[in-house]
Protein backbone atom coordinates (compact mmCIF):
# COMPACT_ATOMS: atom_id res chain seq x y z
CA UNK A 1 0.00 0.00 0.00
CA UNK A 2 2.81 2.43 0.84
CA UNK A 3 4.46 1.73 -2.50
CA UNK A 4 1.20 2.53 -4.28
CA UNK A 5 0.86 5.86 -2.47
CA UNK A 6 4.50 6.71 -3.18
CA UNK A 7 4.06 6.01 -6.89
CA UNK A 8 0.95 8.18 -7.03
CA UNK A 9 2.73 11.00 -5.24
CA UNK A 10 5.66 11.03 -7.66
CA UNK A 11 3.38 11.05 -10.69
CA UNK A 12 2.06 14.55 -10.22
CA UNK A 13 2.17 17.39 -7.79
CA UNK A 14 4.25 18.02 -4.68
CA UNK A 15 2.71 15.48 -2.30
CA UNK A 16 4.12 14.95 1.17
CA UNK A 17 3.50 12.06 3.53
CA UNK A 18 1.24 13.17 6.37
CA UNK A 19 -0.73 11.69 9.25
CA UNK A 20 -4.35 12.26 10.22
CA UNK A 21 -4.20 13.43 13.84
CA UNK A 22 -7.95 13.69 14.48
CA UNK A 23 -11.26 14.71 12.97
CA UNK A 24 -14.27 16.52 14.34
CA UNK A 25 -17.74 17.53 13.20
CA UNK A 26 -18.09 21.25 12.58
CA UNK A 27 -20.30 23.80 10.83
CA UNK A 28 -19.76 26.35 8.09
CA UNK A 29 -21.81 29.29 6.80
CA UNK A 30 -23.74 28.20 3.69
CA UNK A 31 -25.94 31.22 3.16
CA UNK A 32 -26.89 34.26 5.17
CA UNK A 33 -29.12 32.33 7.59
CA UNK A 34 -28.14 28.74 6.83
CA UNK A 35 -25.38 26.62 8.32
CA UNK A 36 -23.94 23.42 6.84
CA UNK A 37 -22.28 20.44 8.54
CA UNK A 38 -18.87 19.07 7.58
CA UNK A 39 -16.00 16.98 8.93
CA UNK A 40 -12.77 18.85 9.69
CA UNK A 41 -9.60 16.73 9.52
CA UNK A 42 -6.39 17.69 11.31
CA UNK A 43 -3.53 16.46 9.11
CA UNK A 44 0.08 16.85 10.26
CA UNK A 45 3.26 17.21 8.18
CA UNK A 46 6.37 17.64 10.34
CA UNK A 47 5.58 20.57 12.67
CA UNK A 48 2.61 21.93 10.67
CA UNK A 49 -0.98 20.81 11.20
CA UNK A 50 -3.50 21.62 8.47
CA UNK A 51 -7.24 21.70 9.12
CA UNK A 52 -9.03 20.61 5.96
CA UNK A 53 -12.71 20.11 5.17
CA UNK A 54 -14.98 19.43 2.23
CA UNK A 55 -18.56 20.60 1.86
CA UNK A 56 -21.16 17.84 1.93
CA UNK A 57 -18.76 15.39 3.63
CA UNK A 58 -20.66 14.74 6.83
CA UNK A 59 -19.24 11.32 7.69
CA UNK A 60 -15.49 10.78 8.18
CA UNK A 61 -13.62 9.01 5.39
CA UNK A 62 -10.26 9.09 7.21
CA UNK A 63 -9.40 8.06 10.76
CA UNK A 64 -6.74 9.21 13.27
CA UNK A 65 -3.47 7.42 12.57
CA UNK A 66 -4.11 7.05 8.83
CA UNK A 67 -1.09 7.87 6.66
CA UNK A 68 -2.04 10.02 3.66
CA UNK A 69 -0.38 12.01 0.89
CA UNK A 70 -1.07 15.75 1.07
CA UNK A 71 -0.49 18.56 -1.44
CA UNK A 72 -1.38 22.08 -0.26
CA UNK A 73 -1.63 24.99 -2.69
CA UNK A 74 -3.01 28.17 -1.13
CA UNK A 75 -6.35 27.35 0.45
CA UNK A 76 -6.79 24.10 -1.51
CA UNK A 77 -5.53 20.70 -0.40
CA UNK A 78 -5.44 17.46 -2.36
CA UNK A 79 -5.41 14.33 -0.20
CA UNK A 80 -4.74 10.76 -1.31
CA UNK A 81 -6.10 8.68 1.54
CA UNK A 82 -4.85 5.33 2.84
CA UNK A 83 -7.08 3.48 0.33
CA UNK A 84 -5.65 5.45 -2.61
CA UNK A 85 -8.68 7.70 -3.17
CA UNK A 86 -7.88 11.27 -4.22
CA UNK A 87 -10.10 14.09 -2.89
CA UNK A 88 -10.01 17.90 -2.97
CA UNK A 89 -10.42 19.76 0.33
CA UNK A 90 -10.48 23.35 1.51
CA UNK A 91 -7.83 24.46 4.02
CA UNK A 92 -9.79 26.02 6.90
CA UNK A 93 -6.90 26.39 9.36
CA UNK A 94 -3.19 25.88 9.88
CA UNK A 95 -0.99 25.75 13.00
CA UNK A 96 2.73 25.45 13.70
CA UNK A 97 4.02 23.47 16.67
CA UNK A 98 5.50 25.72 19.38
CA UNK A 99 9.14 26.61 18.82
CA UNK A 100 8.97 26.25 15.03
Please report, for each region that a protein language model flagged, where it lies by residue.
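Extracytoplasmic/secreted envelope proteins and their assembly/folding machinery
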Residues: 17-20, 40, 62
Amino acid sequence: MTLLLSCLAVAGDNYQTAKVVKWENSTYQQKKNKVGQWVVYYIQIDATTYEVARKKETKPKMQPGDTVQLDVKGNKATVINARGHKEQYQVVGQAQAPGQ
